[in-house]
UniProtKB/Swiss-Prot annotation:
Gene3D superfamilies: Structural maintenance of chromosome 1. Chain E
Keywords linked to the UniProt accession: Cell cycle, Chromosome partition, Meiosis, Nucleus
Residue ranges with Basic and acidic residues bias: 254-263, 272-282, 395-408
Amino acid composition bias (Polar residues), ranges on this chain: 467-487
Species for this entry: Arabidopsis thaliana
Identification of the protein by name: Sister chromatid cohesion 1 protein 1
UniProt xrefs under Pfam families: Rad21_Rec8, Rad21_Rec8_N
UniProt note on tissues of expression: Isoform 2 is expressed at low levels in buds, leaves and roots, whereas expression of isoform 1 is confined to buds.
Assembly description: Component of the cohesin complex.
Region annotated Disordered, chain positions: 211-294, 395-416, 461-510
C-alpha cells in the first residue's frame, strides 16, 4: 500500500492528493479495497466538492485514476443514501409510536424476570363503611325503569333484628372483626309499608308497569299457590316509631288495620282487570321458525335382530310419503295426446315438424274403420268357431284339400285377397272353399287396388296392411311376420280406440283362431288345447325391393389421408409402394397408433393394399382397387 502510494505520488503529484485521510484517498480506498467507512467519516465527505476536484484536478491525472475515483464516489454516495434512508424510517417509527396509546399493564401479572410481587399489588384494601342513605325510599320512586316484581313470587321477610350491631362500641373492634354489619347482610324491603311515605301511588307502582298483562297470562296460576298473595308488612324500625307511642297501643293497631284494608281494596281493583284480560282469548303468537339442527346420539343402543328386520321390511312410511308427493310440471292434455297418437307413425318421432292437414285427411280416410250396425251377429260365429267340433271339421277339410292346388291358387294373384275378404264378409255363413274360389279377381279390381297401394309409403292396400313375407321350407310362415288390419279381422265389431291410459289393441298372436278367413296347418294336436304355430299366410302385396345399404360416410381425417395418398400415387414418377414406418417418422406413440388405425380402415374399404412380409416388420402400402 505504501509502495503504491509512493509510486502514485512520484508520478502524478504531491503526497497530499491520495493520502489515507484525504477525501480522494478515502474514495480511492472505497473503490479499490472496498474499505468500510463509518458514519463520522461519511458525514465529513462532501460529494459535490470531490466531484469538482475530479473534474478539475489541481495536478494532471491519468484516465484510469479518474475512472477509479468516479466509481468510488458512486459507492460512497450509495452508502450515504442508505444511512439516510435508515434514519428516516427509524424516525417515522418513533413518531408513530409516540402517538400510539399504550395499554396499561395488568397489575395482577408479574413483570418479566420477577418471581415475587409487591405487597400492595396482592393486598386488597380494607372495607370502608359507606353511607347508603335512605336507600329504601329511593327504591320506591317510579323513576327506576327496570324495577319489576311479581305478585305471586314476592315474600317479605327480615333476616336480622333491628337492634343487632347497630351501635358497635369502639373498644370491641377486635372482637367484631369477623362480624358483618347489618346493612351489608340485610335485604331491603321493596313495599315500604312501614316507611313515612305511605302514598298508594308509590307503594303500588309495580302493579301498573308495562308488560304486566303478558306476565300474568304466561304464568301458571297453580305455581306458587302456597305463597300468600297479600303483602305482609314487616315490623317497623325503632327510629320510625314516634316517641311516646307504644308499638302495642290500640291506636297503633288501628293504623295498621286501616293500612291493610286499603291495601286489600287496592289489590282487588288491580286484580279485576287482570282477570278480565286473562279470560279474553288471546291471538296465538307466531314463533320464528328455527332451522333444523342435527343431533347426534352418542349413547349405545342395542336393538334386537328381529325388530331391526321388521323395521327394514316395513314399507308403510315409504308409501305414505309417496302419496304426499305432487307431480311437478305441466301435464299434457289427454286430447292432445290422443290426437298425436292418431297421427302417422313417422310423426311420432318428430316433435317440431308439422303434418299437412290435407295429407292427414287422406291418411285418416284410408285408415278409417268401417262401422257396422250389426255388432252382435259376430259372436255366435265366434263361439261356433271356437268349439272343438268346428276345429276338428276345419282340420279334416284341410287334410282332404290338395296342398298343390291351394298353393297354385294363391300364387296366381297376390293382390286379390283384399277384395276377397271384402266380398266374403258380406255373408255370414261363407265357407273356406268360397273364400278360396273368390281369390281370383278381375283386372279392374287389381288395378284399383294397385292404385290404393301408392297412397302412402307406409300403407299398402286399402283394407289389409301387411309387410312382405316369404314362406318357409315347409310352406308355412310364422304369424309374427304379418299384420292384419281390424277391418278384415273384425268387420262387425267396433274397433277399440287406443289411448295413452289404456292398453294396446290385442294383436293376432293372442287370438289366432278368430281369423276365419285363413286355414291353419297343425303339425300335431296337443291333448288340452291347440296352437297356431304353423299357419299358411297369403301375401297381400307384392314383395318390396330391399334398399341397398348406404355406404358409411368417411371421416374427415380418413378422407384427408385418402386424398393425399391418391395424389401421391397419381403423381408421375412417384413410387407405387410406400412404407408405413417412414410415414410415421417424427410422430409420437399416440399419433402413430392413429395412423395405423386409419390405414386399417382404408385397407378394409379397399382403398389401399397392405403387405407385411414378417411379423413386427415394415408395413408396405400400395394403391387399392377402390381408390
Amino acid at each position: 500500500m505504501l509502495r503504491l502510494e509512493s509510486l502514485i505520488v512520484t508520478v502524478w503529484g504531491p503526497a497530499t492528493l491520495l493520502a489515507r485521510k484525504a477525501p480522494l484517498g478515502q474514495i480511492w480506498m472505497a473503490a479499490t479495497l472496498h474499505a468500510k467507512i463509518n458514519r463520522k467519516k461519511l458525514d465529513k465527505l462532501d460529494i459535490i466538492q470531490i466531484c469538482e476536484e475530479i473534474l478539475n484536478p489541481s495536478v494532471p491525472m491519468a484516465l484510469r485514476l479518474s475512472g477509479i475515483l468516479m466509481g468510488g464516489v458512486v459507492i460512497v454516495y450509495e452508502r450515504k443514501v442508505k444511512l439516510l434512508f435508515d434514519d428516516v424510517n427509524r424516525f417515522l417509527v418513533e413518531i408513530n409510536g409516540a402517538w400510539r396509546t399504550k395499554s396499561v399493564p395488568d397489575p395482577t401479572l408479574l413483570p418479566k424476570g420477577k418471581t415475587h410481587a409487591r405487597k400492595e399489588a396482592v393486598t386488597l384494601p380494607e372495607n370502608e363503611e359507606a353511607d347508603f342513605g335512605d336507600f329504601e325510599q329511593t327504591r320506591n320512586v317510579p323513576k327506576f325503569g327496570n324495577y319489576m316484581d311479581f305478585q305471586q313470587t314476592f315474600i317479605s321477610m327480615r333476616l336480622d333484628e333491628s337492634h343487632v350491631n347497630n351501635n358497635p362500641e369502639p373498644e370491641d373492634l377486635g372482637q367484631q372483626f369477623h362480624q358483618a354489619d347489618a346493612e351489608n347482610i340485610t335485604l331491603f324491603e321493596y313495599h315500604g309499608s312501614f316507611q313515612t311515605n305511605n302514598e298508594t301511588y308509590d307503594r303500588f307502582e309495580r302493579f301498573d308497569i308495562e308488560g304486566d298483562d303478558e306476565t300474568q297470562m304466561n304464568s301458571n296460576p297453580r305455581e306458587g299457590a302456597e305463597i300468600p298473595t297479600t303483602l305482609i308488612p314487616s315490623p317497623p324500625r325503632h327510629h320510625d316509631i314516634p316517641e311516646g307511642v307504644n308499638p302495642t297501643s290500640p291506636q297503633r293497631q288501628e293504623q295498621q288495620e286501616n293500612r291493610r284494608d286499603g291495601f286489600a281494596e287496592q289489590m282487588e281493583e288491580q286484580n279485576i282487570p287482570d282477570k278480565e284480560e286473562h279470560d279474553r282469548p288471546q291471538p296465538a303468537k307466531k314463533r320464528a321458525r328455527k332451522t333444523a339442527t342435527s343431533a347426534m346420539d352418542y349413547e349405545q343402543t342395542i336393538i334386537a335382530g328381529h325388530v331391526y328386520q321388521s323395521w327394514l321390511q316395513d314399507t308403510s312410511d315409504i308409501l305414505c310419503r309417496g302419496e304426499k308427493r305432487k307431480v311437478r310440471g305441466t301435464i299434457r292434455p289427454d286430447m292432445e295426446s290422443f290426437k298425436r297418437a292418431n297421427m302417422p307413425p313417422t310423426q311420432l318421432f318428430e316433435k317440431d315438424s308439422s303434418y299437412p292437414p290435407q295429407l292427414y285427411q287422406l291418411w285418416s280416410k284410408n285408415t278409417q274403420v268401417l262401422q257396422t250396425s250389426s255388432s252382435e251377429s259376430r259372436h255366435p260365429d265366434l263361439r261356433a268357431e271356437q268349439s272343438p267340433g268346428f276345429v276338428q271339421e276345419r282340420m279334416h277339410n284341410h287334410h282332404q284339400t290338395d296342398h298343390h292346388e291351394r298353393s297354385d291358387t294363391s300364387s296366381q294373384n297376390l293382390d286379390s285377397p283384399a277384395e276377397i275378404l271384402r266380398t266374403v264378409r258380406t255373408g255370414k255363413g261363407a265357407s273356406v272353399e268360397s273364400m278360396m274360389a273368390g281369390s281370383r279377381a278381375s283386372p279392374e279390381t287389381i288395378n284399383r287396388q294397385a292404385a290404393d297401394i301408392n297412397v302412402t309409403p307406409f300403407y299398402s292396400g286399402d283394407d289389409v296392411r301387411s309387410m312382405p313375407s316369404t314362406p318357409s321350407a315347409r310352406g308355412a310362415a310364422s304369424i309374427n311376420n304379418i299384420e292384419i288390419s281390424s277391418k278384415s279381422r273384425m268387420p262387425n265389431r267396433k274397433r277399440p280406440n287406443s289411448s295413452p291410459r289404456r292398453g294396446l289393441e290385442p294383436v293376432a298372436e293372442e287370438r289366432p283362431w278368430e281369423h276365419r278367413e285363413y286355414e291353419f296347418e297343425f303339425s300335431m294336436l296337443p291333448e288340452k288345447r291347440f296352437t297356431a304355430d304353423k299357419e299358411i299366410l297369403f301375401e297381400t302385396a307384392s314383395t318390396q325391393t330391399q334398399k341397398p345399404v348406404c355406404n358409411q360416410s368417411d371421416e374427415m381425417i380418413t378422407d384427408s389421408i385418402k386424398s393425399h395418398l391418391k395424389t401421391h400415387f397419381e403423381t408421375p414418377g412417384a413410387p407405387q409402394v410406400e412404407s408405413l414406418n417412414k410415414l410415421a417418422v417424427g410422430m409420437d406413440r399416440n399419433a402413430a397408433a392413429k395412423l395405423f388405425f386409419q390405414s386399417c380402415v382404408l385397407a378394409t374399404r379397399g382403398v389401399i393394399k397392405v403387405n407385411q412380409a414378417e411379423p413386427y416388420g415394415d408395413i408396405l402400402i400400395a394403391r387399392g382397387p377402390n381408390m
